[in-house]
């Protein structure tokens, strides 16, 4: 939690240090691995971030939050097709939450498929919110 708070405050190096110190190498926690990946994404270390997202997925296969964050990593780079692949996989998981589905709607909309994006978004939102 401390590492995430530091990252939210823009203190990425301190956040990275906190997350790494909290990790137990013998029994890695997928949440900490994913948090470290997200921080590396913020530091524009995409390759290292994606490697860690994949490690988190090895520890917790098909975890929607990790798949979604991996997809967002590709969004930040402008690779919307790859991003959509990960986002769709995330959204199809039984335990996917609203944020995951909204991220899918975002990446579909960024590709100009507005009707499809609105349909995805409207599953969670009022019609007015989905059109916004």
Where are these regions (language model features)?
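Structural marker of alpha-solenoid helical repeat scaffolds
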Residues: 25-26, 59, 92-94, 123-127
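Helix-start (N-cap) detector for alpha-helical repeat units in TPR-like alpha-solenoids
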Residues: 29-31, 64-65, 98-99, 130
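Canonical tetratricopeptide repeat
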Residues: 1, 35-36, 69, 103
């Amino acid at each position: 939690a401390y590492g995430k708070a530091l990252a939210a405050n823009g203190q990425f190096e301190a956040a990275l240090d906190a997350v790494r110190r909290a990790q137990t190498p013998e029994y890695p926690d997928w949440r900490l691995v994913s948090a470290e990946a997200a921080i590396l994404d913020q530091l524009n270390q995409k390759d290292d971030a994606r490697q860690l997202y994949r490690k988190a997925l090895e520890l917790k296969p098909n975890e929607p939050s990790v798949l979604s964050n991996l997809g967002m990593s590709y969004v930040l780079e402008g690779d919307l097709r790859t991003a959509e692949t990960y986002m769709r996989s995330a959204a199809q998981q039984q335990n996917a939450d609203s944020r995951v589905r909204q991220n899918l709607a975002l990446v579909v909309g960024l590709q100009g498929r507005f009707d499809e994006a609105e349909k995805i978004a409207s599953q969670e939102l009022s019609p007015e919110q989905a059109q916004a």
